[in-house]
Amino acid sequence: MRRVLSVAFVASVMFASALIAAELKSGLQPGDAPPPYNVKDITGPSEGKSLCYRCKYGARPVVNIFARELTPEVVSLVKKIDGVVGENGEKKMAAFVTLLTNDPDKDEAKLKEIAKKEGLKNVPLTVFDGIAGPEDYKISEKADVTVMMWVGSKVKVNHAFAKGELKAANTKAIVADTKEILN
């Protein structure tokens, strides 16, 4: 009897965790217009400068990955998006990563190391000073990773993941969703 109850308890906890992850809402939602915000470019063409990539990319198809930590899973996602951007140059696709941090100077070397190690060519790694992120973007404090895709100044896709919830299957779905901003 104890074994049955233990199995039932574990199953209910797993179901509840999956439900919470599925319902995590973070960032701008489809239909919203992404407002400008400034980041410090660490690995992109404006390395060392503060700029607004949202403004620079204008109405182009854009993937913006907000992360509070660059875990191996996040790095894998960035590398895959880097490839998609490279394959869609004729459509002027763009992407950038915004690391949300309270210590931007401390994270610069790590970002440069990741970009070099992974051979990132199309996705600038940037830092935003403040773990909460740009206020107008409504990044949930429960979200470790928030991915937004927009084109023509309208968000088309949003994915959000709590700490440890971004998996390979999610990365595959995010990459597949880039078609929503490329058509």
What are the functions of these language-model segments?
Residues 50-75, 93-98:
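Short active-site neighborhood of thiol/selenol oxidoreductases, capturing the structured segment around
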Residues 1-12:
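Bacterial N-terminal signal peptides that target proteins for export
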